[in-house]
Amino acid sequence: TQIEKDLKQQLYSAEVDKIKSYMIDNSTVEIPDEYLQARLNEYIASFTKENVKDGQTLKKYLKSNYNMTVDQATEKWKENLTDQIKTEFIFGLIAEKENIKMDDDAFNSYVDYIVSASNGQFSKASEVYKYFGSGHKDEGKTYLKNQYLVNKAIDTVTEKANVTFEDGTAAPDTSSGSADAE
């Protein structure tokens, strides 16, 4: 049923979140300041383009929609990007060490899914690439290919991991066809 599928996905997401947190907390990752700043600048530009309309400023948009200053939002975005970049670095290295390779058909399906799930924001793959490349298709495609490999590495680790939750219970097996809920 759909409820079982949703529950299975929620459990899998909880496992992935726990694994990502564990890996970040137990790894030493150096992010070059210039790289973090470049990613932050790209994020701010993209956020502004997507959200700030009709002559409104980022400052006014953040204040009216989030009750935050630009500095507060920038600090929060920087924290989130730091974890995201650490995840990309860690699982990118795992993909390399585990010899996880690009499957072009699966990658194209991944991009097609992004197009179909975009609620009309994208109508073709080139628009997705351009969006994720901050206007540069080739950079966006490279970024998405890296993300795809990172996600495959996360899936590989999740399949092999023995995840337990705060209450000490093991995560249910989400690889089988059903998920049991109590």
Model-derived segments and spans:
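Extended, charged alpha-helical "arm"/coiled-coil substrate-binding scaffolds
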Residues: 1-182
